[in-house]
């Protein structure tokens, strides 16, 4: 099985996903990463625990034209590699990846998104609900599985989101 992990920056994968990659390797998976290379500014971090790394110019700002470049590059990578599973992380990494993976889902690729904490939650500013909730709800339609970190996010996703929630 071939798995792609995406995030806005490579340091996110280094800091949070090494245990996941180890489990995937134990199950015989080949793991690739697509994210912006920011490791030069992160002393001691290296993506030496995956088979392939793609430098994709994601930007944290939704207004950045780099996200369009990231979308185009990622779409080509996904078409070339034909992944079985694409697991995306971080808000913009998740949005751009899910858009780029739409066609591959039609051919059986599963797309997972880990929400490391919704920006809309009980007590959050109304602005957060107005902006972020509709985006997550819409993008859940092109997501096979949403993985939540907190119990509050899990309960909210179970009620409001269109895909399978864990």
Task: Locate the predicted segments by residue.
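Nucleotide-sugar donor phosphate/pyrophosphate-binding loop at the beta->alpha transition
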Residues: 16, 65-72, 110, 120-138
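Helix-loop-beta element that forms the nucleotide-linked donor phosphate-binding surface
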Residues: 47-51, 154-166
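Short beta-strand scaffold positions
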Residues: 35, 87-88, 148-149
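N-terminal subdomain of nucleotide-sugar transferases
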Residues: 1-37, 81
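Glycine-rich phosphate-binding loop signature in dinucleotide/nucleotide-binding domains
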Residues: 77-84
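Membrane-proximal helix-turn-helix segments that form the acceptor-binding/catalytic region
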Residues: 22-27, 72, 130-147
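Active-site proximal beta-strand in glycosyltransferases
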Residues: 2-4, 102-118, 136, 147, ...
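Short His-centered aromatic/hydrophobic patch
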Residues: 88-94
């Amino acid at each position: 099985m071939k798995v792609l992990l995406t995030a806005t920056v490579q340091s996110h994968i280094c800091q949070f996903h090494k245990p996941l990659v180890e489990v995937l390797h134990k199950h015989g998976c080949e793991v690739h990463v697509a994210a912006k290379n920011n490791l030069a500014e992160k002393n001691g971090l290296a993506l030496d625990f995956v088979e392939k790394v793609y430098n994709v110019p994601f930007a944290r700002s939704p207004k950045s034209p780099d996200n369009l470049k990231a979308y185009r590059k990622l779409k080509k990578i996904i078409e070339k590699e034909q992944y079985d599973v694409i697991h995306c992380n971080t808000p913009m990494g998740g949005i751009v990846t899910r858009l780029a993976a739409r066609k591959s889902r039609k051919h059986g690729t599963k797309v997972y998104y880990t929400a490391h904490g919704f920006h809309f939650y009980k007590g959050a500013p109304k602005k957060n609900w107005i902006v972020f909730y509709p985006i997550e709800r819409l993008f859940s339609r092109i997501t096979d599985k949403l993985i939540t970190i907190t119990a509050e996010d899990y309960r909210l996703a179970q009620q409001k989101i269109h895909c399978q929630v864990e």
